[in-house]
Amino acid sequence: MILEIIIFLLTTLVGYYYWSYKQLHKYFDDRGVKYVPGLPVFGNVFRSTFGKTHSLYDLLDVYKAYPDEKYVGYMEPMLPILLIRDPEIIKNITIKDFDHFTDHRGHFFSEDSDPLFAGSLFLMKGDKWREMRTTLSPAFTTSKMKYMMPFMVENSNNVLEYLNEHQSQDIDVDDLIRRYTNDVIASSGFGLQVNSFKNKENEFFQIGSNIFEFDVRQKIFTVLISQFPSLAKKFGARLFPDKTYNFFREIVLSTMEYRRKEKVERPDMIQLLMEAPRGKKLLLFSEWTAEELISQVFVFFAGGFETIASAIAMTIHELALNPNVQEKLYQEIRNNNEKTELTFENLHELKYLDCVLNETLRKWCPAIIMDRICVKTYELPPPREGGKPCILKPGDVVYNMVNCLQMDPKYFPDPEVYDPDRFSDENKHNIKPFTHLPFGSGPRICIGKSRY
C-alpha cells in the first residue's frame, strides 16, 4: 500500500513538472518569441545550479542563440523570462515606461522570516520602495559622501603598511582586496575600526567572506523554494542563517544606542541613516523600525562587499596584463599627488582613472542583468521585423541584459580587449546609449550612483 502511494505521488509529481515544462514552451510560442528549450525543472540554469559554470554563461548561451532578435525566451525553474537584448527597449522599460516595471522580481522570503534581505530597499515594491528611496536619497549626497573619504584613506594606509612588511613574500591579491574592502565598509558603514591585515580572523571579515558562498546544497534549496514559494514563506525559509542576522542586528542596535545616549556623531552610514528620516513626513512608515534600518545597513554591506572587491581585483588583474595602461594610470596619479594630496574633490580630476574603472565594469561587470517585474499590462514591440508585438501581463519577468551587451562586438568592437580609451572624452560619444549600464538605469539605478 505504501509503495503504491509513493509510486502515485512520484508519477503525479513527474506529470506536473512535465506539464509545467510544456507550459513554458507554450508561453513563448504563443507570443512568437524564440527560445532555447531547457530541461524540465531546471530550465536553462541546470549547469549553474550544480556549479558547472557561472550563471552568466547560461544567460550568454541564450543571448547568443538568436543574435538578430530584440528579445528572447529564457527559462529558470518553472519561470518564463524575457531577455531584453535591444538598448532602446531597455531604455523604455527602465525609464520611459518605468511605471509599468517599478519592481524587482519577487522573492521567496517574507519580511518576518528574513528581514535582513526582504526588508531592504532593493526588494521593496511600489509606493513603499518609492518612499524609502526618497527618504534615503539625502544620505547619499556628495556633501555627505565626502566625509567618508578619510576612512578610505586610513584603510588604504593599512594596505601600504601590509605590503611594505611583506615585500619579499607572495601576496594573494584577491584576499588583499577583500580585506581592504571589508575594512572600508566596516569603517564607513558601521563605525568599526577593523584591521583585517593584523586581525585576519575577525568576525566581520569572516561573515562578509561567507555571506554569498552558496554550495550546491544551498543552490538546490533555492531551486526548491522557487518551486514552492508559499511553503517557503509559511515555514520561514531564509537566505541567511541566524548567526548572520544576529551579528548585524547587534552591531547596528548597539551602535545606535551608544550614539544616542552619549550624543556621539560620526560621518558614517549608520549616522546618515539615523538622520535621514528627520524632518520628513512619512506616509507609509509611521517611523523607522530597527529592523528596517538594520536591513538597509546590511544591504549596504552585502551589496558593496563582493561587487567592490571584484571590481578592484579585476582592475588590478587587467593592469598587470596591460603594462601600458598601468603606466599611464600611474603617471596620472603621480602627477596629481605631486600637486596636492588626494581629496574627495580632486579625485574627480583623475580622468584616466575614471576610464580605467569604466572599462573594468564593462568587461567584468558584477551586475549581470537588471531584473524587472511587469506591474501593468504592457506591449513590447515585435522581437523581429515581421513579428508580432508581445503582450506582458502583471507578474511577467524581464531581464534587461547588462554584461552580455557590454561584451557584444556589435556595440563594443574587440570586446575582449581591455581599452580604457573607449571612455575618454574623445571617444565616449561612440558608445551607444544603454549598452553600458554597470549601475543600472532609471529610477531604480544604484542609489549611490544616482547622486553623481
Functional labels for PLM-detected ranges:
Residues F46-D68, E250, S254, T340-G387, ...:
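Conserved cytochrome P450 K-helix E-x-x-R motif and the immediately C-terminal K′/meander segment
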Residues I2-D114, D127-E131, F151-E161, T244, ...:
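N-terminal membrane-proximal hinge/A-helix region immediately C-terminal to the signal-anchor transmembrane segment
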Residues F46-F50, L60, T141-S143, S168, ...:
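Conserved cytochrome P450 catalytic core segment spanning the I/J/K helices
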Residues M78-K91, A118, N157-L160, I171-K198, ...:
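Hydrophobic mid-domain F-helix/FG-region of cytochrome P450s
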Residues N400-K428:
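Conserved cytochrome P450 K-helix/beta-meander segment immediately N-terminal to the heme-binding cysteine loop
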Residues T307-E332, S450-Y452:
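Cytochrome P450 catalytic-core helices
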Residues M1-V14, Y74-L82, S143-E154, N164-S187, ...:
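Cytochrome P450
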Residues A118-G119, G387-P389, P394, E426-Y452:
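Cytochrome P450 heme-thiolate "Cys pocket" and heme-binding signature region
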